[in-house]
């Protein structure tokens, strides 16, 4: 079995390198290349099926259990992933009208993320790949955010962004400005030196008693606010790092 491992080389850019099990990391096939992708880095269990670069299905199970705690509880998240991963994968394959035997490879989020949550997805993907005798491709989920611009459905009008381009990567746990020169060549130009934008918003929402998740709530209130109410000085620091 071929397992493609990801080595971070520049910024967050991974390159697929083969393990000693095989001297190539390329999927060779005369048939359409069909990949099952599994994501479990935080509190959403997701599975998608891609065929020759076209999205056939995308299924996500969210976890409402964290709302009572005002944030994601890692232990509860990993347990919920264990309950959700089988039905989510089954539904993704069913929606794509793809059998397990049709799969060319399985891709799974290796990190960054919550250790317990990642372990569920990686263990499931590894076991499934071994059982089917197909390659397992480990993926950096931040690169996945950036390359999401290239995902498209069948018959969808699609124009991929030209290289190089600048990407503002904002998620719950990461906020970065990334220069993308190629799908496997990326450079971090600047990033938050403390909390990510999502973390800052959720913390503010919790402190003010607005509930979780805080993003939709604060966004709604911000639209009703006065953007000139507070005057902030312009930052004058070296580099492009910033702080929330």
Predicted regions and their residues:
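Short, acidic/small-residue loops that bind anionic groups at enzyme active sites
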Residues: 125-146, 194
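N-terminal polybasic/positive-inside topogenic patches
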Residues: 15-18
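Conserved phosphate-binding catalytic cores of ATP/NTP-utilizing and phosphoryl-transfer enzymes
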Residues: 29-31, 139-165
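Short Gly/Thr/Asp-enriched flexible loops that form oxyanion-binding sites at enzyme active sites
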Residues: 108-132, 151
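Short beta-strand scaffold segments in enzyme catalytic cores
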Residues: 45-50, 167, 175-179
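Short beta-strand segments
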Residues: 37-38, 107-109, 140, 166-171, ...
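A short helix-loop
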Residues: 29-33, 41, 58, 161, ...
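N-terminal beta-alpha supersecondary unit
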Residues: 31-102, 108-112, 141
């Amino acid at each position: 079995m071929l397992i493609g491992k990801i080595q971070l080389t520049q910024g967050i850019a991974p390159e697929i390198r083969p393990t000693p099990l095989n001297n190539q990391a390329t999927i060779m096939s005369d048939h359409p290349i069909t990949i099952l992708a599994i994501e479990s880095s935080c509190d959403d269990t997701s599975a998608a099926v891609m065929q020759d670069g076209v999205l056939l299905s995308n299924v996500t199970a969210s976890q409402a259990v964290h709302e009572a705690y005002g944030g994601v509880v890692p232990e509860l998240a990993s347990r919920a992933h264990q309950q959700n991963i089988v039905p989510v994968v089954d539904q993704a394959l069913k929606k794509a009208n793809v059998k397990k035997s049709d799969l060319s490879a399985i891709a799974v989020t290796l990190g960054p993320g919550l250790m317990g949550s990642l372990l569920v997805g990686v263990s499931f993907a590894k076991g499934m790949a071994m059982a089917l005798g197909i390659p397992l491709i480990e993926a950096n989920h931040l690169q996945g955010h950036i390359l999401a611009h290239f995902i498209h459905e069948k018959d969808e009008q699609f124009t991929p962004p030209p290289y190089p381009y600048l990407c503002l990567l904002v998620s719950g746990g990461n906020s970065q400005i990334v220069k993308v020169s190629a799908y496997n060549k990326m450079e971090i130009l600047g990033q938050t030196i403390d909390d990510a934008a999502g973390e800052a918003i959720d913390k503010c929402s919790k402190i003010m008693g607005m509930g979780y998740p805080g993003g939709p709530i604060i966004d709604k209130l911000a639209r009703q606010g006065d953007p000139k109410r507070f005057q902030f000085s312009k930052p004058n620091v070296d580099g492009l790092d910033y702080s929330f």
